[in-house]
């Protein structure tokens, strides 16, 4: 039995038709690849924003703790998203020493407010720098945009902390300062650690805490004004009296 195979029909699929079809498929694949790249960049951008926001919030409360924790997580291999600049030994040593200084100053009445005043610029700048480094490590978000997010968030949380401390300092007992300082340190450590493993959930918690802090400061506005008046009075009392013991007419 002989099986005869059909001979191919020459010219059934012209060369021009095949080339056009191939070109169309190539263009379609290129468009799909471009769209896929955009989606990947968008997903990466969205994934780094929560960590940027959380690190900014935490930096406004204790910037040295944020740098120290992230640096240790990167140096020990806990997280691959930590920039190499934060893992340097000299950075970790300086951050650790300053963290210990803040841990002491932050628990002493009135000294904590002086410390907060000195860090009105330092904390937002630290939040912006850490956020920019995180964005640069991921390569998905412009460093300038990340710095703006981290710096503004750090400034807001710093103002909440400073305002709350002013209100607490109207009370003569020191235990409120100590308890609040310990709660802040533990909160920063816990949320930054949580952000390394679940950045979205940590960002939600940080946003809720920031909103609650703003509401609390508004509620304590009268105490804050009282603290500012007392500080102004103490400064006026420390001024040297004019010659002859007479005060200038006001």
Q: Residue ranges of each PLM-predicted region?
A:
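Short, highly charged, low-complexity non-transmembrane loops/tails of multi-pass membrane proteins
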Residues: 227-247
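Helix-coil boundary and interhelical linker segments in multi-pass alpha-helical membrane proteins
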Residues: 41-47, 73-89, 131-146, 195-204
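C-terminal ends of transmembrane helices
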Residues: 100-113, 161-169
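The feature identifies polytopic integral membrane transport proteins across all domains of life
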Residues: 48, 142-148, 168-181
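Small-residue-rich segments of transmembrane alpha-helices in multi-pass membrane proteins
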Residues: 120-132, 176-190, 238-240
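Mid-bilayer segments of alpha-helical transmembrane spans in multi-pass integral membrane proteins
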Residues: 125-133, 143-164, 186
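Cytoplasmic-side transmembrane-helix entry/capping segments in multi-pass membrane proteins
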Residues: 88, 113-125
